[in-house]
Amino acid sequence: MDIKKVAVLGAGAVGSYVIWGLSARRDIELGVVADGPRGERLKKDGCAINGKIYRPAVWTPQEAHDADLLIVCLKYGALPGALDSIKAVTGPHTTIMSLMNGVDSEDIIASAVGGEHLLYSLIKVASHKEADGFHFDPETTVGIIFGEKEPPCDSPRVKAVEALFGGTELHFRATDCIQEEMWSKFRLNVCNNLPQAILGAGVGCYRDSVHMKAISDGLRRELEAIAAAKGIDMQKVDAVSGKGCAVKPSARYSTLQDLDAGRHTEIDMFSGALIRMGKELGIPTPYNEFAYHMIKALEEKNDGKFDYTGPNQEMTWAR
């Protein structure tokens, strides 16, 4: 199996890492899937990554049809609206890798195109947007981790992806424990993203505050209880996958970046999913319930819901 046509859906923080790496391959077709005004903007402006403009092809979903590999790099909230595009891209032999956060995007995609197309995967990259585009440190980036959900783990498509990435500066590795790896990253996201987003401080807060560490640990305990109930043994991968990318103490992860920019977050994918799973399994999730409602309230604040200015304010009472 050779991968010669690669389509990337989503050219944001995660997609930028993929585009940066695969643009070095001159022996493949590389395109970003986009149409309408967004597609025109990408054709005109390209993708600004680490101070350089990259110009992959821009394909409509129909033009990208039957790509050998489709890499999905969307925000969680955008996935339901993108399923028609994913179906249009997917041909009989298309492999799909979802580099989205969380642990259920593969299930959502599989419901639209069939689970046989999915090669389970994740990415660890500390990417952020500045005025001149997206930035990340290639050297400290952990990169892309992928593997088959079921044996054989050294399948032809795993070997094909290894060969594709091997000719680039992308950091990557294949694993026999992809579900445990995904839950390990999910744990990092929940425990590191959410408390700092509520506080509005850099990640150094976990090192410097016993209170922030206590909140992070509470979220961790709930997640690990749910994972154990689902038969996910994250101890299998703790030695190789228990840490994220090295960052400065001032670093702000994706949830706080979203709030800083006035965007809605992926809290439904993080605590929202854990609350749902906890209810299904009979496992209490008070830390995640608090984080969920606090971040939802911060979204409402960004939306202007609590803008109590003006002369004609209706009186209210605490209750």
Predicted regions located by residue number:
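NAD(P)+-binding Rossmann beta1-loop-alpha1 motif at the extreme N-terminus of oxidoreductases
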Residues: 1-55
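NAD(P)-dependent Rossmann-like dehydrogenase/reductase catalytic/cofactor-binding core
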Residues: 2, 217-319
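A structural signal for isolated positions on well-ordered beta-strands in alpha/beta enzyme cores
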Residues: 7, 29-31, 97, 119, ...
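Short, well-ordered alpha-helices that flank and scaffold nucleotide-derived cofactor binding pockets
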Residues: 20-24, 84-88, 111, 272, ...
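Glycine-rich beta-alpha junction loops
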Residues: 37, 101-103, 122-127, 150, ...
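Short, charged/polar "capping" segments at the starts of alpha-helices
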Residues: 38-43, 106-107, 154
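Rossmann-like NAD(P)(H) cofactor-binding subdomain of soluble oxidoreductases
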Residues: 51-135
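Internal alpha-helical scaffold of NAD(P)-dependent oxidoreductase catalytic cores
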Residues: 88-89, 112-117, 132-235
